[in-house]
C-alpha cells in the first residue's frame, strides 16, 4: 500500500514538473527581446531548462522557474547559477535577490537619465520608465555599438592593426590573473561548469560603452572588441565569486548558533570576566625605601650593628631636614596670610635688586641647569620687563608681567654660583661683581615670595600666555625647592589657564605664524608632560587625559613638521618628496639634520613618552588595578607598555640615540654656540633617563604582583617563570646602563634637580638588590662590579673636590646623604664577608667623613633659613627688645612648636640650635612619661598663646596616627619616619609616597573643613585600610634575588604583620620624639593646609 502510493505520487510529481517546464519555455520565448538580441556578440546561449524539483509549484501568479526567487519583483530571466543548483538545494533561490543582477542592456532614455532600466513589457514594447514618462524606448546606442564592433572585426580579419585602449589591457591583465588564482583553487568546479557568458558579456559591453557615451552622446568613442575567451573567463570568475560570497554570507549568519552548539557538545564553560578571580587587593606605589625595606636592609647588610649605630646618622639628618621643612613652610604660610590681609601694598612686596644685578641674574638663566625650561623662558622679554620696572617713564608692568619677572629672577639667583665672578653691565660702565652666599639666598627667597603674592592675585587677573609661563616656572621651582605636593597645586592652576587659552585644540593654531605655533605647542607639551611627571612622583591620577587634546597626536606633528617647518629650511626638499613622507618617523629623520630643530623633535618624543606613562599609571598603579583586571590582564598590560616603550626607542633618530648622540650633536653644532650643544645633550640624557625609569618600574611591578599572587600561577595562560626571569634580567641590565650613563655625565651645579628622581630610582633599587644577593657570597663578582659602578657614580655626583657637596639645595643634600649611607654600609658588608674584598679594596671609612660633612652643610642651610625668617618677619624694634637671640638655657630647652601660631624669637632660636635628644641615653624619657610631659607642655603653651581647640584636635589625630597602623604611612608620605619626604618629591624613592594630595586633588573644597571632619577622616581611613595595613607598599619586591620558579615561598598575612611590627619597633623611638617630644602638630592637617595655601 505504501509502495503503490509512493509510485503514484512520484508519477504525479513528474507530470507536474514536465508541465511546468513547458510553460516556462513558452513564457521565455514570449518575453524574449527579438529586436535587441542581434546586437550581442555571437549567437545567444539558450537558457537552461529547469531542473526537476520536489518543491510544489507557485499557486498563483506568473509561472516561474523553480530556480528563480519567489519574490514578485524579481526579474523573469535565467540566473547564471541555475546550472549549479541541485534539486535538493532550492533554498538558495530565496537569497538570489542579494545579487541585484541588472538587465543586459538599457534603453537610450534610461541610459541618459542614468537610472535602472527594466524588462520590456510585452504589451507596450517599452520598459517601465519609458511607459511612466511617455518616451520612446529605443536602443540606438547598442545598434551603433554593434556596427562599430563588426567594423573592427572586419579590419582585424583584413590584417589591419587595431589599437586597444589602455583600460581594456588593464582589465584583461587583471581578469587573467584573477582567473589563474581561482583556477588553482577550484580546478574541479572549473572543468565541470559550462561556459555561460551571454548575460555577463552583454552587461560588460554595455557598461563599458555606456561610460564612454555618457561624456558625449553624439560622438561615439572608438571601441575595440574583447576576445571571446576573455569574456568567458570573466563571466566564469564572476560566477565563482558570486557563489562563494553567498555561501560565506550564510555561514556568517549561522556562526553564532554554531559556536553555541559546539560549546554545548564539547562541554566548554564560557567564564564571565566578572566572576574570574582577582589579584590580592593592593594598591602599588612608586615608593622604594619604606620602613619594611629599611628593616630588610639592616637585617641583610648591617646585622652586625646595634640599633644606635644604625639609626644615629639617620636620626641626625632627619632632625635637621625636618626643621628646615617647617621653616620653609612657615615662611610661605606667613607671607600668604600677610599678603591677603595687609591693607597697604607697600608692606607686601619685597624690593628687587638694582637693574644691573637683575639683568645679570636673568642672563644666567641660559644654562644647562635649566635645560628643560629654556623653551618657556624668553630672556629678552624678561630683560624688557626689567627695563620697564626700573624706569616708570616706560610704563607699568601688568600683574602677569611682574609675576614672570620675579620668578625668573628667582631662578636666576638659584643657578648663579656665588664663587664665580659676574660681569655687570650698567649704562656707563662694566663692573666685576661677586655675589655673597647669603645675598643670593635673600634674593631667591624675596623674589619667590613676590611670586607667591602674584600667584594669589591671579584669581582676579586675566590669564594670558605670560601668566602661564610664570605658573609653570613657579611649579617647577616649588617642586625642586619645597615639595611636589605644593607644586602640584600650582600646576593645576597652570593647566586650567592653558585650557582656557585652548592650547589643547588643534584648531587654535590654524591662523598663527610658525614661531607662535611652536611656542604654544611646546608650552602645552610641557604642561602635559609635567602633569604625567607629577603623576609618577605622587602616584596620583593625572589631571589631563589623551582625549583632552588633539595636538599631541602623530598626525598633528606630521602636519607641523612636514607642512610648516620643512618647507622653511635652508635645504629645500622637493614637493614630491615631502608629499610622499606621511609617517612621523620619516619626517623626524629629515628634520633631525638641523640642530636648531632638535628641541622640537625632543618635544615630540617627550609627549609620546608622557602618553605611555599615563597608560602605565592606569594599568599598574591605579587604585582600581586589582579591582577591575585579572592577573593575566594586568600582565598583558605590562607587556604592551613595554612594547610601546621599545617602539618609541626604536623610532628615535640617530642624533638622539644614546650610543653616539654627543658625536652627532657636535658635528651639527659647528655653527652653533657651546651652550646650545650642552642644552641639547642635557635634554637628550633626561629623555633617556625617564625612559629607563619606566622600564625599571615595569620590571619591578610585574615581579611584585606575581609574587603577591603565586596561587594564581597555575591557572594563568602566561609562562610565569619566563616572565619573572626576563623581568629580572631586564631590571638588572637597565639599572647597569643607567649607572654607566650617570658616571660619565657632566654634572652642573644644579642640574641634579632635573634628573634626580629618575637617577635615584636606579640607585636605591640597586642597593636593595645588593642587599638581597649579599646574604651569601655566591654572586661576589657581580656584587663587586655593581658596587664599583655605584662608587664611580657617587664620585661623579660629588664633583671635583666635592664641590657639589655644599650645593645649597636641601633635597640634593638629603638624597646624597642616603646614597652615601647605603654605599658605606654595602662596602662594609662586602669587605667583611666577600672573598674578593682584597681585590676590590673598597674604602668605606672615606664615606664616614662624607656623611658628617653632609650633615654639617645641611645644618648650615637650615640656619640660613632661620636668619632669613628673622630678618623677614620679625619687627626690628621687637627684635632689639629681646636683645641676644641665643642663650644657653634656650639651646637646651624643649619647646612646643605650633606652626599655625605666630612664630616667636624663642621658636627660631630653638629651631636653629636645638636637636632631638639622644635616643639611647639613660635620661631619655619612656614613651609614656614623654607623652604626658609633652602633652602638658603643649597644653600650657596653648593657654599662653591663645590657641583654639584646633590644637587639641590635632593632638588627638597624632594619637590616632601613632597608635593605629603605622604601615599606612607608606601610602601617605606625611608619616615618613626617617627622612624629609615632605620636602623632597624625589625622595619618593627614599621614603614613602609623597601622596598626601590624592584626596585633596579629588575634592579641593574639603581642605578647609573643621577639625572634627579631619578626625573623622583619619579614623575612617584607619578603619578602611585595617585589613591592608600589614603589607609593604614598596615597589621593590621582597625576595627579588630568590624568585626562581616555584621555589619562591608564598608570604602569608602573618609574615607581613610580623615584618611590619619589627620595622615599626626599629623606628618607633624617632616617631615618639617627633610626635610627642619636641614638635606638636598634626601632620595630616598641616600638609593639607600647606597645599591649600600654595
Swiss-Prot record:
Membrane topology summary: Single-pass membrane protein
SUPFAM superfamilies named in the record: Zn2/Cys6 DNA-binding domain (SSF57701)
Biased composition annotated in UniProt, kind: Low complexity: 935-945, 953-989
GO cellular component term, pick one: mitochondrial membrane
Segments passing through the bilayer: 755-775
Record SMART domains: Fungal_trans (SM00906), GAL4 (SM00066)
Compositionally skewed regions (Polar residues) per UniProt: 1-12, 19-29
Transmembrane helix listed as a keyword: yes
Name recorded for this polypeptide: Uncharacterized transcriptional regulatory protein TBS1
Gene transcribed to yield this protein: TBS1
